[in-house]
Each structure stands twice: as C-alpha cells, then as structure tokens.
C-alpha cells in the first residue's frame, strides 16, 4: 500500500480546520471543507487514494452520506469505477434495503438500492467516508453492503479519530485504511 510520509500527512492535516464546541460543547469538529476548497490538497489526497486503490480490483465504491459522497465519487471517477450512495432513509427513489444501528441515545438507519451492485456477481466494494469515530455508521454500511450480492472488501476513511475506537470495531468486519489518525 502506498503510504504517506509524515510531512505529507502534516500537510493534509494543516488543511483541516478544528472547530471547538461544534455541534455541542466539548466536541472538536474536524471541518474538511477547508481541505475541499484547497484544490492542491484535494487533488493530492485523491491522487494518493487512486494510487492505493487503482490496482485492487474493486468493482464499486460506496460512499456514506454525505461527506463520503464527496470523496467516494471523486475517487470513483479518478479510477473509473461506479459509485454507489449509501443514504439516510427515504432519500433513494427505488426499492431499498436498510440497516439500523445504535447511536449514543437512540437509533439511526441507512439505505441502499436493492440493485446497487447489479451486473457484477460477488462485487468487491470499497466503502469510503470522511472520518470514523465510534464506527456505528461504518459497521452498518459494511453490513448493508454484505446484505446484497456484494462484499465490502475494505473501508477507507480520511480521518480516524483513534480515541473513539471505531476503526478497531470495523476492522473485525473488513480491512481498514485511514489516511490520517488523530
């Protein structure tokens, strides 16, 4: 796998803004919009991910709503494979399957079109999102993909928030790659 140098990691980290007390007091939010509006940093990141994934025989990239759409669609275009959105309930127009998952206080749910990976038997899918914290959404997405005729062969995150332990939980289900760990 193509690894970044510490200097390259520091460069990407320098383009991500920390916002204190968002969305609630005590939280430090990793704002990726500053990376997205830095064309050099975004192109560097996408070129890096293309090097990592271009020869892995992946059939589809699935991105988790909403920031996973940004990275997933850009990477899919760069390595010339289809992109599949994983969405919140009632956002997809055709027949869907869904997966519920636990939150700190309650439950949430994600959906995918029932035929999202049609045309490729035993499709190999890369799951992508901007960051992983507790891993609840990512675990649900892996389960959702695996409910179809496909297999999630790897999950990729721009940022792994190590203290929350989500990457370790998802690693029990599929291979993990995080560009940055904080």
From Swiss-Prot:
UniProt GO cellular component terms: cytoplasm
Keyword set, alphabetical order: Cytoplasm, Glycosyltransferase, Purine salvage, Transferase
Protein name from the UniProt record: Adenine phosphoribosyltransferase
Family annotation (InterPro entries): Ade_phspho_trans (IPR005764), PRibTrfase_dom (IPR000836), PRTase-like (IPR029057), UPRTase/APRTase (IPR050054)
The protein's role, per its UniProt record: Catalyzes a salvage reaction resulting in the formation of AMP, that is energically less costly than de novo synthesis.
Organism of derivation: Campylobacter hominis (strain ATCC BAA-381 / DSM 21671 / CCUG 45161 / LMG 19568 / NCTC 13146 / CH001A)
Subunit text: Homodimer.
Enzyme class: transferase
Disulfide links within the chain: none
Enzyme Commission code: 2.4.2.7
Reaction catalysed by this enzyme: AMP + diphosphate = 5-phospho-alpha-D-ribose 1-diphosphate + adenine
Single GO MF annotation: AMP binding
Entry-linked Gene3D superfamilies: 3.40.50.2020
CDD domains noted in UniProt: PRTases_typeI
Keyword Metal-binding: no
């Amino acid at each position: 796998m193509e690894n970044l140098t510490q200097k390259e990691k520091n460069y990407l980290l320098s383009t991500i803004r920390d916002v204190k007390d968002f969305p609630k007091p005590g939280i430090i939010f990793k704002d990726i919009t500053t990376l997205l509006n830095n064309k050099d940093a975004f192109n560097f990141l996408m070129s890096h991910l293309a090097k990592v994934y271009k020869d892995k025989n992946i059939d589809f990239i699935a991105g988790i709503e909403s920031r996973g759409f940004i990275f997933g669609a850009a990477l899919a275009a760069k390595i010339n494979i289809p992109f599949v959105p994983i969405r919140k309930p009632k956002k997809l127009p055709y027949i869907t399957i869904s997966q519920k998952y636990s939150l700190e206080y309650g439950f949430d749910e994600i959906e995918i079109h029932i035929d999202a990976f049609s045309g490729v038997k035993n499709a190999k899918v890369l799951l992508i999102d901007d960051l992983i914290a507790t891993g609840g959404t990512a675990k649900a997405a892996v389960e959702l993909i695996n409910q179809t005729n496909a297999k999630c062969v790897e999950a990729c995150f721009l940022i792994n928030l190590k203290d929350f332990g989500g990457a370790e939980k998802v690693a029990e289900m599929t291979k993990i790659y995080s560009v940055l760990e904080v």
